[in-house]
């Protein structure tokens, strides 16, 4: 059955959540679903990830230099778009876009799904950002977590609407090499404590 799915994001900048949403959008459009990606601030963090052909793209461009007014403009434009697609399921992978979508959900009939991509105890940084994230989660019809530990951080009212779905893997990865090969391990990521590279190094040292 063909479904209409709308992914709301700040931009398609070079980050993990954006990579995951582009992977999922690619697979879903291949499965025959109608996929739309809405960027609320397309120029803020760049557009590092390209979307598959067949995925509809909508960019919301605001005109004010005032941050609060820009925020209101983004919500108004998003509501206007969603009202034309009441049967679409709306997804968000970032706390900032989840908050915008949560406010918009008061005025539309769409099913809302939020995905927690990080350790909720540490990300987003700052109590006020975490408060906005927790506020947004109250308005989700369903929530996606990567681990049971992440889901257990939230109150029961959130946990009972949550499901555990691990990260997807790119289907275009090359097949593993058979036979003898060098014992060399390569990783590519930001040098940031969140990536916990020491744990990875220690884990591979045990092999």
Describe the residue ranges of each PLM region.
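Nucleotide-sugar donor-binding and catalytic loop/hinge architecture
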Residues: 1-3, 172-184, 191
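N-terminal strand-loop element at the rim of the active site
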Residues: 2, 7-69, 153-155
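Short hydrophobic "strand-cap" motifs at the C-terminus of beta-strands
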Residues: 8-9, 146, 187-194
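A conserved mid-protein helix/loop that constitutes part of the nucleotide-sugar donor-binding site
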Residues: 15-23, 183, 192-206
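A short, histidine- and acid-enriched strand-loop-helix "catalytic/donor-clamping" loop
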Residues: 65-66, 99, 108-127, 142
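Short His-centered aromatic/hydrophobic patch
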Residues: 74, 92-98, 116
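Membrane-proximal helix-turn-helix segments that form the acceptor-binding/catalytic region
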Residues: 79, 107, 126-144
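Carbohydrate-associated surface elements
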Residues: 149, 168
